[in-house]
């Protein structure tokens, strides 16, 4: 015959079971259960399995150490990349300033060359004029 279930529970049934369960949990002080959950299984039955767990835990610890080192390296790499980006921006700014200054200097030198050529042409014209005047005066006399 199937078990009979109550369709409706009254408050005494619910609170009574909650109180008794709470009392059992608080009053029963089982160190074995706490040891099991805090330290893991022990004894001859769990020996090889416990060794496997320790081995796996050691591997997990090694992986954690490697990942922490990798994260540290990534952070350092990011810092170096930031420094490199700052240096490249500075270099780009310096290159732009150099380009502008070189264009300005090229113009100055071009004008200076033009001035020197103009002065030389003027001196040559004056010398030629003086020579012509001397020759003309020599033939007039």
Curated annotation (Swiss-Prot):
This protein's record includes keyword Phosphoprotein: yes
Region of interest (Disordered), ranges: 1-51
Vesicular side: 137-141
Cellular compartments annotated: Golgi apparatus, trans-Golgi network membrane
GO terms under biological process: cellular response to type II interferon; endocytic recycling; Golgi ribbon formation; Golgi to plasma membrane protein transport; neurotransmitter receptor transport, endosome to postsynaptic membrane; regulation of Golgi to plasma membrane protein transport; regulation of synaptic vesicle endocytosis; SNARE complex assembly
Coiled coil: none
Superkingdom of source: Eukaryota
Residue span(s) of domain v-SNARE coiled-coil homology: 52-112
Modified residues (Phosphoserine): 17, 30
One CC-aspect GO term: trans-Golgi network
Keywords, sorted A to Z: Coiled coil, Golgi apparatus, Membrane, Phosphoprotein, Transmembrane, Transmembrane helix
Function: Involved in the pathway that functions to remove an inhibitor (probably synaptotagmin-4) of calcium-triggered exocytosis during the maturation of secretory granules. May be a marker for this sorting pathway that is critical for remodeling the secretory response of granule.
Assembly and binders: Identified in a complex containing STX6, STX12, VAMP4 and VTI1A. Interacts with BAIAP3; this interaction is increased in the presence of calcium.
Protein name: Vesicle-associated membrane protein 4
Organism: Homo sapiens
Encoding gene (name): VAMP4
